[in-house]
Amino acid sequence: MSKPVSERSVRLLDSMSPILHFLNDSIWSSRRHETGICDFTIGNPHEMPPRELVEAYSRWIEPRNEHWFAYKMNETGPRDVLEGSLRQWRNIPFEAEDIFLTNGAIAALAVVLGTIVDPGDEVIFISPPWFQYEGMILNAGGIPVRIRLLPETFDLDLGAIDEAIGPKTRAVIINSPQNPTGRIFPSEVLKDLAGMLESKSRESGRTVYLISDEAYSRIVFEGKTFPSPVAFYHESFLVYTYGKVLLAPGERIGFIALPPTMSERVQIRKALVGVQMMNGWSFPNALLQYALGDIDKIGIDIAHLQRKRDRLYTALTAAGYEALLPEGTFYMLVRSPWRDDEAFIELLARHDIFCIPGSTMDIPGYFRICFTPGDDTVERSLAGFELALRQAAEMGEARS
């Protein structure tokens, strides 16, 4: 009897099984809609969206002509907006024709991988990773190669990356600021990475591309400068989404940008558009393209987000937790008092506190806090966090 689904879909499901189990079969999944819980799991909004965002949508929803809601691809107006924005934010002279509008960063990553990866090509990604990198590489026909961040510092392990690059390597995916650690990789490390990729490309006679996932690049704290990996390596793809800085992940708009230094840009441009069309029509809806000039100027209150970060970090470390202070993103990585992080997540749930277990992100023994909830939720959670830690100590080392 024939199988109802493809082998590829089976592999994809297997790569996603830890997070799918959490989303569909955990205590959180059964209680997520309860009022009064402290939900620190996913980067969803917990307060009303920025008024400016609602006004932008209202301003552009009214049709100006009969073609207002016609098919949209990489339209000239929003591309021009992004050319100016990228020159401001990245200080790189991107050109409008090298910018490709997508319905979010997930679509952008899928389009880039579909453009450059052939079956059997290897794609390196960094662990602990965002949940979907491995599955997206598999979906493109590639072979995922996992490289862990250096322990304790959570910096890029350039030695391990160097050793992993071989004749089949097609790309390296870097996410900075990094989910889930909040780490911003420093310029010196990115320069060394660029030099390595240039050397490896020369040796093999085949370009090793850098895919720079910069979804959180506008969410940085304490006035830090975000160094874009694209600034250091010619053969790079910049991937971005507005869903994070707007805290509106249900409104899907993002882009791919090619730096002017990239070789073979003309051929890559054509291929990207073709893959966009075949990859489920990976272009943003008309309304979002019209509104992009307004959307690009809007963002959540980063200072407020930093205050919530600081409140959680100070309270948790004072209670006895070990936590990594994030330099960017809206996530904080905290060490579980038990090696079995899923068991500790269940203990937190008894106090109506919900976080993501590190085992879903290939970092067992930790858990991730998303600090997008409001101040009242943060304050209500602190006593429960402290009590759960005391209970874990009282229950002994059975789970540690």
Residue ranges and their predicted role:
Residues 286-293, 305-316, 323-335, 361, ...:
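Conserved glycine-rich beta-strand-loop-beta hairpin in the small C-terminal domain of fold type I
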Residues 62, 66-205, 217-233, 237, ...:
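Conserved core of the PLP fold type I
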Residues 279-280, 284, 306, 332-351, ...:
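Accessory recognition modules or surfaces
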Residues 5-104, 111, 295-299, 391-400:
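N-terminal small-domain helix-loop-helix segment of the aminotransferase-like
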Residues 79, 212, 309-310, 382:
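Short amphipathic alpha-helical/adjacent loop interface patches that line ligand
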Residues 234-306, 389, 396:
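Conserved core segment of the aminotransferase class I/II
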